[in-house]
Amino acid sequence: ICSGLVGSEMCIRDSLNTGPNVNPAKATAMAQAAEEVGFESVWTVDHVVIPQDYKSAYPYSQSRRLGDGTENIDLPDPLIYMAYLAAATTKIRLATGILIVPQRSPVVTAKQLGTLDYMSGGRIDLGIGVGWLEEEFQAIGVPFEKRGKRTDECISAMRALWKDDIAEFHGDLINFGPVFCRPQPINKTIPIIVGGHSKAAAIRAGRIGDGFFPARGSVSYTHLTLPTTRLV
């Protein structure tokens, strides 16, 4: 996970992916053990549904299928999962890796994350992505087109809700305000790490993110990608 994008250093942090672990006792033990041995954060994944038949190509596997064809797996809601782990831990950071932001209302998502950050003592990191599974968007009832632009507006809208005493946002796709949204995050913001494998993702990270999460590739690939984040 790369942060400090406007500087000259890359920071790779010790993090643990929770995977499809929905056994309450095992999930608690995993998070507590990670905290005890010094992991900085645990990361959840996000898919609301996996359509049984889909033509979209999964970009992170040679099979082009999620889970190499084993799509029928537990993928818990990441924010509820993080809330559960927050209650079982005291200092480890809790992150989404990643949250498919354009599938969700930015106002509701900002409220959920603001509440979770406030009640966990400021331990939330928001990894975000634009999504790749068009059929999932169709099932949810959200347009797949313009998801990049929608993601950009969602991030700006959520930042306003977290920071401003009275927030409003007026974009092409997102429009609201003036509104109160309490509680706000402890630090009036939540770190946003942009995930993805494309040049567009790297540019988005440099333009509106606080970090970059290259979703695939070697360390050498990451070193090649990072300069792109600094072009904006």
Q: Locations of the language-model features?
A:
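Receiver (REC) domain switch/active-site residues of two-component response regulators
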Residues: 40, 210-211
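N-terminal beta1-alpha1-beta2 module of alpha/beta enzyme domains
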Residues: 8-88, 190
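Glycine-rich phosphate-binding active-site loops on the catalytic face of alpha/beta enzymes
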Residues: 215-218
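Short beta-strands and strand-loop turn motifs
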Residues: 13-15, 94-97
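Internal, glycine-rich beta/alpha segment that forms the wall or movable "lid"
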Residues: 52-54, 64-67, 81-83, 92, ...
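Single conserved hydrophobic/aromatic residue that forms the stacking wall/gate
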Residues: 1-12, 223-232
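Ser/Thr-centric signal marking residues that sit
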Residues: 44, 89, 96, 115, ...
